[in-house]
Amino acid sequence: MSWQNNLHSVSPYIAGEQPELTDMIKLNTNENPYQPSLQVQKVIEDFKSENLRLYPSTDAKFLRKALAEYHHLNTDQVFIGNGSDEVLSLSFLTFFNGQRAILMPDISYSFYPIYCELYRIPYQKIPLADDFSLSVNSYFQENGGIVIANPNAPTGMAISLQEIEEILQNNQDSIVLIDEAYIDFGGESCLPLLEKFDNLVVVQTFSKSRSLAGIRLGIAFGSAEAIAHLYDVKNSFNSYPIDSLAQKIGEASFTDETYFQKSVSKIITTRENFKNELIKLGFQVTDSKTNFVFVHHPKIDATTLFKVLYEAKIIVRHWNQARISDWLRITIGTDREMNTVIQFLKEYLKNKEKSY
């Protein structure tokens, strides 16, 4: 028998393009357009390379303590992983045993079903409404767990804290995992609900609002028992997943709250201005609470618009996927970058009108 017959085949996640050209306006992977805080830069400058000969802390205890204090939690309620993708992967493996289907929106982060296929976890996609809103009542059914990105990606839309609490109250025998990768851009975090629900696990990241996508740091918050189980699984794979420099950078990123709030506020302001300009141009735009917008134009095919923008050295994100194939996701960059996009779209639409 050929060894290929024993392979476990999955369709891997396809990440956004990282173009080699440096003159592109890169708006396809939701990176923060602003640099990390000066505190982070100082840690990098002061880091002694001789320390790299030593293994890092196995549980990132100082970073966990800093996060616990920031969010008014106990240290044993905090888990640190190598990016939120690893945290999500380990969470699926830890909390969803595969006996019953887990529930997730049909339009959401495309890594979720891949984890299910990889770990042989049955899952059921719950359709969003035509306007991409989520009905909490759809999650009041038997399940092996629930996974919801809030705010959602790629739609950018958020559900309220009250709606999350309703889901938790009606699913107290299942883990409810809320992925808050974009929470700092306008959503309402459900971390306060950890006091009431031991079946809640909240995942966040340093990549977006903290401008640290390059160092790969992710977080899970939950009950002490849930986090202990998560560490048991993590340590069964790798007891040293977070390097020493990343741990120090993570700590430093939470010491400059003024810079953090200023950076996030700038992105939100730019997003709202960009949304308004798109609407003036005839685009349909969802009510984004993230650092991106999800857009559709009734007169322009999204595939065509994606290619036209790319040729103009503006790279955005498009999925050839049911229900959203005629939509584009556009990361919020600097004011200058977004103004460039608007001016290009104005010119493109004007020329298109002339050709009719």
Swiss-Prot record:
Modified residues (N6-(pyridoxal phosphate)lysine): 208
Protein transport as UniProt keyword: no
Catalysis: reaction(s): L-histidinol phosphate + 2-oxoglutarate = 3-(imidazol-4-yl)-2-oxopropyl phosphate + L-glutamate
Organism: Lactococcus lactis subsp. cremoris (strain SK11)
Presence of keyword Electron transport: no
Protein name as annotated: Histidinol-phosphate aminotransferase
Taxonomic classification: Bacteria, Bacillati, Bacillota, Bacilli, Lactobacillales
PANTHER family xrefs: HISTIDINOL-PHOSPHATE AMINOTRANSFERASE (PTHR43643:SF3), HISTIDINOL-PHOSPHATE AMINOTRANSFERASE 2 (PTHR43643)
Enzyme Commission code(s) on record: 2.6.1.9
